[in-house]
Amino acid sequence: LVATDSIPAGKRDNAPLREQEKAINRDLNDMITPDGAGLTVLDLVKKYIATKTGVKHTTRAGYGTVINLLDKDPFGARRIDKIRLSDAKEWLIRLQQVDKKSYSAIHSIRGVVRPAFQMAVDDDILRKNPFEFQLATVVVNDAVTREAITRKQERTFLDFIKNDTHYSKYYDGMYILFKTGMRISEFTGLTVKDLDMENRTINIDHQLQKTGTLVYIDTTKTYVGTRVIPMQDDVYECFQHILKNRRPPKVEPMIDGYSGFLCFDKDGKPMVAMHWEKYFQHAVDKYNSIYRVQLPKITPHGRVIIRTS
């Protein structure tokens, strides 16, 4: 049969045998491994992840999320040489429209799957990477715009915190986050030894992270993130208050060799980013329940305090 021939009754509409032979010979001549080396999408992603050693805990957790998704999704069981550009696009569209995954989640998933397929191309297992396209042309970017809050909003919020009977106990920490530009995980990772009160400097060379139930110490997000920053007078006073009011448990908790953390929760465990995110959220909610002029949602994120409204 050739492409123009009609398909006999009871036969499958496969590529004509001559075309299949040409494709096989072409792959052999180009040293492309036949049948995608028998790898499924899940197999390929696992193989790719196995090459990524020395990554951070958060990155490793993200890999696990993608593996779990592909393990349950029929797309993960498909053979990689059968995935076309349109298949890749349709899958991502389904993740958003049917599975209701956010743009940022899909961006992270593709951030693992695309380099996995590129590895197969580089290894001469595939001829093309079906995920080599602009994501924004396929799925809708529903990510919330993030921008720093205004100086006026900052002053309004901090004044409210300082004078509130409940949230005033978090004022020093919130003030430090606003004024130093520290990441929230860098602040929660600070220990007494990181504060040089005599020379008024803050040593930042690690961060306290939580992934699921695992609380651990990690390096700073980037190499330049390791730094020593000066304390201005107002920040110095806030750290003085924190040290004076610090109430550690009888046995100082130790995490990956670090102890002497500055802030503790009601169970005597070092506070993590999640605690402070909740304090910010609840404080804004309380403010907005009292005053007519509303504050936006305020989140300690990265090195700036952002609004997400």
Q: What do the PLM-derived regions correspond to, one by one?
A:
Residues 1-35, 222:
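Short, surface-exposed polybasic/aromatic micro-patch for ligand or macromolecular engagement
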Residues 12-13, 37, 46-125, 165-166, ...:
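N-terminal core-binding DNA-recognition domain of tyrosine site-specific recombinases/integrases
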Residues 107-111, 126-128, 132-190, 198, ...:
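Basic, Lys/Arg- and aromatic-enriched nucleic-acid-binding interface segment
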Residues 95, 176-177, 309:
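Short alpha-helical segment immediately N-terminal to, or the first helix within
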Residues 159-170, 180, 229, 245-254, ...:
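Short, basic (Lys/Arg/His-rich) helix/loop patches that form interaction surfaces
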Residues 136, 189-247, 253-254:
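Conserved tyrosine-mediated DNA breakage-rejoining catalytic core shared by Y-recombinases
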Residues 19-22, 43, 47, 65-69, ...:
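Generic recognition of well-ordered alpha-helical segments
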Residues 45, 88, 113-116, 124, ...:
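Conserved hydrophobic/aromatic pocket- or pore-lining residues that grip, position, or stack substrates
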